[in-house]
């Protein structure tokens, strides 16, 4: 099951990924998000793995971005993570197994001048994930925050850095492979 705003993107992913289903959802709308999670549970049962890969960022110094933009970043990067984890973690706890994986980026570790609107929310996301881990790891649930310190090879990043060589960009399939590995790593 996959959640995204863009229905066309979801359809493309459904076509690419066997036995997958996409659910269009605006993560900032709590009622809509809860309904979407309920539909996923109805269609597939409770997930054994929850990967939070949603992100919203704002560029510009603190004088340039609005409080509304900052709130929107928090709603997607932090609040949606919290809401979904609250819905799926209790069943993982009952089973004594599961994984919650959160992807983030370098801004979770530092606040550059023009990334305050993103960095503050990614840092909060990282700390929230660490809190999940301290509570859930003893209950058998693996929790990890993965920092992606690279430009992901996407259409918009290629447009943003048109002069960069191919090896400047990290491949989405390579990220997915590492996420899979971390999700399934042994407890030792």
PLM regions and their residue ranges:
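Substrate-binding pocket helix/loop in short-chain dehydrogenase/reductase
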Residues: 61-62, 69-74
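Conserved glycine-rich Rossmann-like NAD(P)H-binding loop of the short-chain dehydrogenase/reductase
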Residues: 1-10
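Conserved NAD(P)H cofactor-binding loop of Rossmann-fold oxidoreductase domains
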Residues: 53-59
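A short, exposed helix-loop element centered on a Lys and neighboring polar residues
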Residues: 85-86, 130
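Rossmann-fold cofactor-recognition segment
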Residues: 17-31
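Catalytic loop of short-chain dehydrogenase/reductase
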Residues: 99-124, 129-130, 134-137
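C-terminal helical subdomain
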Residues: 138-151, 161-188
């Amino acid at each position: 099951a996959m959640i995204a705003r863009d229905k066309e993107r979801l359809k493309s992913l459904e076509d690419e990924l066997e036995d997958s289903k996409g659910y269009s959802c605006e993560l900032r709308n709590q009622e809509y998000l809860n309904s979407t999670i309920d539909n996923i549970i109805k269609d597939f049962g409770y997930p054994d793995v929850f990967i939070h890969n949603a992100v919203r960022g704002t560029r510009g110094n603190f004088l340039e971005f609005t409080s509304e933009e900052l709130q929107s970043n928090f709603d997607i990067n932090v609040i949606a993570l919290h809401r979904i984890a609250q819905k799926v973690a209790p069943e993982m706890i009952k089973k004594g197994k599961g994984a919650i994986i959160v992807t983030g980026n370098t801004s979770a570790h530092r606040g550059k001048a023009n990334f305050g609107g993103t960095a503050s929310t990614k840092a909060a996301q990282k700390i929230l994930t660490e809190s999940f881990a301290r509570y859930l790891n003893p209950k058998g649930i693996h929790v990890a925050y993965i920092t992606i310190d690279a430009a992901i090879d996407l259409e918009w990043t290629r447009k943003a850095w048109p002069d960069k060589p191919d090896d400047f960009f990290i491949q989405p399939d390579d990220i997915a492979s590492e996420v899979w590995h971390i999700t399934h790593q042994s407890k030792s």
